[in-house]
């Protein structure tokens, strides 16, 4: 079984005060970093942003709001469709405000991607690799 999972989706980006517009989102899961999903947003062949997000939070965000920091997820019911809203917050401004952008993805597509990642590394079976790291560090000293 492949240790990498890729999925490309057309998603909707909405920056502060703008209408939604389509961009590509490339989702990647690598079993070598089992807790993370890398998401690359691109438009007109240009990378707009690259984020590494927690796989567990991504899954939880399909059913309930999660996150309190720079990245937050929440489900959105948009008529007959279910979406996942990924919200990204920038650094604070002098006035206390923050830049904010939201990305809306079909929840079913994200759920399908996560099922593929779970086939590679099941939830709860992830290993942080701390013991291996410490062994390497101690062997070098």
Residue map of PLM features:
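Charge-rich, low-complexity N-terminal segments
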Residues: 1-40
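Eukaryotic intrinsically disordered, low-complexity regulatory linkers and tails enriched in Ser/Thr/Pro
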Residues: 2-8, 35-36, 44-47, 60, ...
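Charged, terminal alpha-helix-loop-beta segments
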Residues: 6, 21, 52-57, 128
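Short, surface-exposed beta-strand/loop "edge" segments at domain boundaries and coil↔beta transitions
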Residues: 18-20, 43-52, 93-101
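Coil-to-beta-strand transition motifs
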Residues: 32-35, 81, 96
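Residue-level recognition of well-ordered beta-strand positions that form the cores
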Residues: 40-42, 87
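Short, internal acidic amphipathic alpha-helical interface segments
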Residues: 49-94
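Mixed-charge, glycine-accented linear interaction segment located at domain edges/termini
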Residues: 97-141
């Amino acid at each position: 079984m492949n240790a990498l999972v890729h999925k490309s989706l057309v998603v909707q980006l909405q920056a502060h005060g703008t209408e939604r517009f389509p961009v590509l989102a490339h989702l990647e899961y690598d079993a070598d970093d089992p807790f993370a999903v890398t998401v690359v947003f691109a438009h007109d062949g240009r990378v707009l942003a690259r984020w590494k997000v927690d796989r567990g939070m991504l899954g939880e965000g399909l059913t309930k709001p999660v996150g309190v920091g720079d990245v937050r997820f929440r489900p959105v019911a948009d008529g007959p469709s279910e979406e996942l809203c990924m919200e990204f917050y920038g650094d604070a401004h002098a006035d206390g405000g923050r830049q904010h952008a939201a990305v809306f993805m079909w929840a079913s597509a994200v759920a399908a991607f996560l099922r593929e990642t779970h086939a590679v590394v099941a939830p709860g079976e992830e290993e942080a690799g701390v013991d291996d790291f410490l062994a390497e560090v101690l062997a070098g000293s």
